[in-house]
Regions:
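Generic beta-sheet signal
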Residues: 4-8, 82-90, 138
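Alpha-helix capping/helix-boundary segments
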Residues: 41-43, 93-94, 123
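Glycine-rich, flexible N-terminal cofactor/catalytic loop recognition
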Residues: 1-64
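Short, charged beta->alpha transition segments
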Residues: 70-78, 124-128
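Glycine/small-residue-rich loop that forms an oxyanion/phosphate-binding "nest" at active or ligand-binding sites
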Residues: 73-115
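Conserved helicase motor
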Residues: 62-70, 143
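Class I SAM-dependent methyltransferase SAM-binding "motif I" and its flanking Rossmann-like core
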Residues: 6, 99, 103-143
Length: 143
């Protein structure tokens, strides 16, 4: 498989990851050595929950926040050009949904890198599902 940008969902709250994330996500996580994250500390904690035996010091983390420039983000994608996949980890829920990960996806698409969203929880989708409203005309205006 060609190196890809994987969008890796994170649990919402204290939910046990095995209850909401498929085993496939774990397999993908274990195949990646480069992660673009909102917060390195919480991303490391999440990865340790998914696989306690993971060697965190063997991984590279790139921090993505409101101070990260587009040029820095483009640099974070450099492993893709070398044939190495990169994962995007948000603070909670799905990356790139009301999240700075969207900027990473846009740059990756412009560079013609494959983007692979993985299955996981989304607070926005869950709120629409539980609202009783028709999701056909749903519009999200931010948190």
């Amino acid at each position: 498989m060609r190196a890809s940008l994987f969008l890796i969902p994170v649990t919402l709250g204290d939910t046990e990851h095995r209850r909401v994330l498929p085993e496939y996500n774990r397999d993908v996580i274990l195949s990646i050595r480069h992660f673009i994250v909102e917060n390195v500390r919480t991303a490391r904690r999440f990865l340790k929950k998914v696989e306690p035996g993971i060697v965190i010091d063997d991984l590279t983390f790139y921090e993505l926040n409101k101070h990260t420039s587009p040029e820095q983000v483009a640099g974070y994608l450099a492993p893709l050009a070398k044939g190495e996949s990169v994962g995007v980890i948000s603070e909670a829920g799905c990356p790139a949904i009301a999240d700075p990960g969207a900027d990473v996806v846009a740059i990756a698409q412009r560079k013609d890198y494959p983007v692979v969203p993985l299955v996981g929880p989304s607070s926005i989708l869950m709120s629409v599902m539980g609202s009783g409203f028709n999701g056909q005309s749903f519009a999200f205006h931010g948190y």
